[in-house]
Swiss-Prot record:
UniProt function note: One of the primary rRNA binding proteins, it binds directly to 16S rRNA central domain where it helps coordinate assembly of the platform of the 30S subunit.
Gene3D superfamilies: 3.30.1370.30, 3.30.1490.10
Listed GO CC annotations: ribonucleoprotein complex; ribosome
Organism: Prochlorococcus marinus (strain AS9601)
Quaternary structure and partners: Part of the 30S ribosomal subunit. Contacts proteins S5 and S12.
Family matches, as NCBIfam families: PRK00136.1
Family the UniProt entry places it in: Belongs to the universal ribosomal protein uS8 family.
Stated name of the protein: Small ribosomal subunit protein uS8
Cross-referenced HAMAP family: Ribosomal_uS8_B
GO biological process, one term: translation
Amino acid sequence: MSNHDPISDMLTRIRNASQKKHTTTTIPGSKMSLSIAKVLQKEGFISDINEEGEGYKSQIILGLKYSGKNKFPTIRSMQRVSKPGLRIYKNTRGLPKVLGGLGVAIISTSKGVMSDRDARKQGIGGEVLCYVY
């Protein structure tokens, strides 16, 4: 089966693994997936990132974070915003604040993939890939 939207596939794998309280999850490797994973790690949603394999067989292993005795997932929701059929672009002023600043929007800009906070600091806009909170 071909995967037409690897970003949605990545978000779904992370969401499913965190709901089942898995400690790690594996996603197919790509530059975009790795960039998104680095933003998630920087923002404190995942614990670690490991790359395995080369070329088309590469995989990224993400360590998921939980809090409290009941292992409540740090990622409560992940929503894909810009889709292959309908791309969503925002300028600096139009960048959304997710949950009043408690969540993060992941933006693909001309300077790479970054969080909405970093994009605002640099004064650039871009494609809104997803919301994470």
